[in-house]
Amino acid sequence: MTELATQPAQDLAEPPIPLVFTDNAAAKVADLIAEEGNPELKLRVFVQGGGCSGFQYGFTFDDAVNEDDTLFEKNGVTLLVDSMSFQYLVGAEIDYKEDINGSQFVIKNPNATTTCGCGSSFSA
């Protein structure tokens, strides 16, 4: 009698994307960097305590890369996320929106259990 070796089926699903940095966001960052006149600038996205829901997002330009930063590149622009913030941003999408209410960077975060009406504060 012949025995057939069976192996568990491999999970063919793609691993989750750690962070999505949209074309719109990258284009706006490129414009802002050009206005500053410093091509070494990178957009740093971070999470800190505060806001009406417990955590809030922050954006700043930085020309330094820290040892614990994760870098994301899109269309020649670099996005930096520190290790503490990264755990709250895994799977999030960073976009730039312009509408009749104004323009702003927007984070769609699947880890947020509640969000504030302003969109810059969340709880996880």
UniProtKB/Swiss-Prot annotation:
It comes from the Bacteria. Iron-sulfur cluster binds at C52, C116, C118. The keyword Hydrolase does not apply. InterPro entries: FeS_biogenesis, FeS_cluster_insertion, FeS_cluster_insertion_CS, FeS_cluster_insertion_RrpA, HesB-like_dom_sf. GO terms for molecular function: 2 iron, 2 sulfur cluster binding; 4 iron, 4 sulfur cluster binding; iron ion binding. One of its GO terms (biological process) is iron-sulfur cluster assembly. Gene3D superfamilies: HesB-like domain. Its cofactor is iron-sulfur cluster. The keyword Phosphoprotein does not apply. Pfam families: Fe-S_biosyn. SUPFAM superfamilies: HesB-like domain. Binds 1 iron-sulfur cluster per subunit. NCBIfam families: iron-sulfur cluster assembly accessory protein, PRK13623.1. HAMAP family: Fe_S_insert_ErpA. Homodimer. Belongs to the HesB/IscA family. This is Putative iron-sulfur cluster insertion protein ErpA. It comes from Polynucleobacter asymbioticus (strain DSM 18221 / CIP 109841 / QLW-P1DMWA-1). The lineage of its organism: Bacteria, Pseudomonadati, Pseudomonadota, Betaproteobacteria, Burkholderiales. The gene is erpA.
